[in-house]
C-alpha cells in the first residue's frame, strides 16, 4: 500500500497511466479476440432524457463531449489561477511562456499546411500538431525527478496552459458545426447567470456546476463544441480566498485526481485504439500522418526555440531563473507530445468526413508524440545533472 500511495503521489503517475491506457487500446483494437468488444463498447448507445430534452450519443461521443468538458473545467480553473496568482500574473512573468506558446502553435500548423495545403480535406487538420498534452508532457518531465529545476517545470506548465487556451480558441473559432441561434441564446443566458453569481459573491460551487450543466447542454445543442462550457464555468468560479478557503482551488484539488486517473486515461483508451491493419510505410508517409509527425516532432521545438530566441534577442523577455536555453529547447521537444489534445482536435476536424482519416491522423499523432517524449526525455536527462 505504501508503494501504491507513493506512485499516486508522484507527478509522473498520471502520464504513466495515460501510456498504459493508450497501449491497452492499441492492443485491444488490433487483437482478433478483443477488437470486436472494443469497438462495440465505443458504439454502445447511451440516452439521457429530461422532460422533452433528449441527448442520444454513443459511448465514444459521451466521453469526448461530456467527460472532456470536466477536463476543460479543470483547465479553466488552472488558467484562471495562473493568470491571477501564478506564473502568468504579471506581464514580465507571462511574456516568455506566452511568446514560446505562440511559436509552438504557429510553426507546427504552418509545417502541417506545407504538406497538406493542396488537399482541401486534410487541410482542415492544421491545428492538430499545434496542441500539447499537458498531463503527458509534465508526466515525462516528472520522470527526471528532483534534477529538474522548479523554474523549468513552471515554464512548461505555463507554456502548456497557454497552449491549451490557444487550442480552446481554435476549437471555438474553426471547429464548429451549423449554429442554432436558440441554443446559443440559452447559452448566453446561462453565462449571464454565471456573471451575476460571481459579481454577487456566491461561493457555493454546486450552484456554478448546476448552471454549468445547463450551459453545457445549450452549447452541445448549439453546434459549438460542448467542452467549451467547462472552460467558461471554470473562469467564473471564485478564486479569492475567504476564511482561508477558495472555491476554485478547492474544486481544482477535487477534480485533479478524477481527471488524471479516470477521465484522461478513459479518453486515451477510447481514442488511441488505432487499427494497424493495412498500415504500410507508404501510408505512414502520406501527407496527413507525415504532416502531423513533422508538426509535432519538428514544428513544436522549432517554433518554441525560434520564438524564445527572438524574445531574448529583442529583450522582450528573459530566461526563467536557473534554466538554460538548451533546457528550453528540450522542453520544446516535450511539447511535441500532442496525444490526447491532438487526438481530440483530429476527431473534430475529420469526425464528420471520413473515419479512415481519423485513423491515419491518430497514427501520426502517436508516432509524433512518442518520438517527442523519447527524444525530449533523453535530451533533458543528458542536460540535467542529478541533484546531490
Curated annotation (Swiss-Prot):
Indicate the principal place this protein occupies in or around the cell.
membrane
Among InterPro entries, the record links this protein to: Na/H_antiporter_dom_sf, NhaA
Question: Where do the TM regions start and end?
Answer: 12-31, 59-80, 97-116, 123-130, 155-176, 181-200, 205-222, 224-236, 254-272, 287-310, 340-350, 358-380
**Keywords per UniProt:** Antiport, Cell inner membrane, Cell membrane, Ion transport, Membrane, Sodium, Sodium transport, Transmembrane, Transmembrane helix, Transport
Per the UniProt topology annotation, the Cytoplasmic ranges are 1-11, 81-96, 131-154, 201-204, 237-253, 311-339, 381-388
GO molecular-function terms, A-Z: sodium:proton antiporter activity
Membrane-topology descriptor: Multi-pass membrane protein
> Membrane side Periplasmic: which residues?
32-58, 117-122, 177-180, 223, 273-286, 351-357
According to UniProt, the reaction catalysed is:
Na(+)(in) + 2 H(+)(out) = Na(+)(out) + 2 H(+)(in)
Q: What's a GO biological-process term for it?
A: regulation of pH
Q: Name one GO cellular component term.
A: plasma membrane
Record's function text: Na(+)/H(+) antiporter that extrudes sodium in exchange for external protons.
PANTHER family given for it?
Answer: NA(+)_H(+) ANTIPORTER NHAA, SODIUM ION/PROTON ANTIPORTER NHAA-RELATED
Q: Which family does it belong to?
A: Belongs to the NhaA Na(+)/H(+) (TC 2.A.33) antiporter family.
Q: What is this protein called?
A: Na(+)/H(+) antiporter NhaA
Organism of origin is: Escherichia coli O1:K1 / APEC
Amino acid at each position: 500500500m505504501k508503494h501504491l500511495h507513493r506512485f499516486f503521489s508522484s507527478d509522473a503517475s498520471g502520464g504513466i497511466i495515460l501510456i498504459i491506457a493508450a497501449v491497452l487500446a492499441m492492443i485491444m483494437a488490433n487483437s482478433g479476440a478483443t477488437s470486436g468488444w472494443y469497438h462495440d463498447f465505443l458504439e454502445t448507445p447511451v440516452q439521457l432524457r429530461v422532460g422533452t430534452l433528449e441527448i442520444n450519443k454513443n459511448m465514444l461521443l459521451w466521453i469526448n463531449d461530456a467527460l472532456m468538458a470536466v477536463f476543460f473545467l479543470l483547465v479553466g480553473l488552472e488558467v484562471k489561477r495562473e493568470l491571477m496568482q501564478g506564473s502568468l500574473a504579471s506581464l514580465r512573468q507571462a511574456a516568455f511562456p506566452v511568446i514560446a506558446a505562440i511559436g509552438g502553435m504557429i510553426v507546427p500548423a504552418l509545417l502541417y499546411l506545407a504538406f497538406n495545403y493542396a488537399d482541401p480535406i486534410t487541410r482542415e487538420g492544421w491545428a492538430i500538431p499545434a496542441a500539447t498534452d499537458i498531463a503527458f508532457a509534465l508526466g515525462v518531465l516528472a520522470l527526471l525527478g528532483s534534477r529538474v529545476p522548479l523554474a523549468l517545470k513552471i515554464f512548461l506548465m505555463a507554456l502548456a496552459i497557454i497552449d491549451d487556451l490557444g487550442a480552446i480558441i481554435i476549437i471555438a473559432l474553426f471547429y464548429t458545426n451549423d449554429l442554432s441561434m436558440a441554443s446559443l441564446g440559452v447559452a448566453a443566458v446561462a453565462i449571464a447567470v454565471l456573471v451575476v453569481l460571481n459579481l454577487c459573491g456566491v461561493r457555493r460551487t454546486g450552484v456554478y456546476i448546476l448552471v454549468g450543466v445547463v450551459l453545457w447542454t445549450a452549447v452541445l445543442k448549439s453546434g459549438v463544441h460542448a467542452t467549451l462550457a467547462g472552460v467558461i464555468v471554470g473562469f467564473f468560479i471564485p478564486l479569492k480566498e475567504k476564511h482561508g478557503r477558495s472555491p476554485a482551488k478547492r474544486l481544482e484539488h477535487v477534480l485533479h485526481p478524477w481527471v488524471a486517473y479516470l477521465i484522461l486515461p478513459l479518453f486515451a483508451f477510447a481514442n488511441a485504439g488505432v487499427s494497424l491493419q493495412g498500415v504500410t510505410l507508404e501510408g505512414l508517409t502520406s501527407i496527413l500522418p507525415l504532416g502531423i509527425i513533422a508538426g509535432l516532432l519538428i514544428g513544436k521545438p522549432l517554433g518554441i526555440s525560434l520564438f524564445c530566441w527572438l524574445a531574448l534577442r529583442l529583450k522582450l523577455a528573459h530566461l526563467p531563473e536557473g534554466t538554460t536555453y538548451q533546457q528550453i529547447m528540450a522542453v520544446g521537444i516535450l511539447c511535441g507530445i500532442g496525444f490526447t489534445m491532438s487526438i481530440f482536435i483530429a476527431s473534430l476536424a475529420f469526425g464528420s468526413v471520413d473515419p479512415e482519416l481519423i485513423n491515419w491522423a491518430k497514427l501520426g499523432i502517436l508516432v509524433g508524440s512518442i518520438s517527442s517524449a523519447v527524444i525530449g526525455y533523453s535530451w533533458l536527462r543528458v542536460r540535467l545533472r542529478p541533484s546531490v
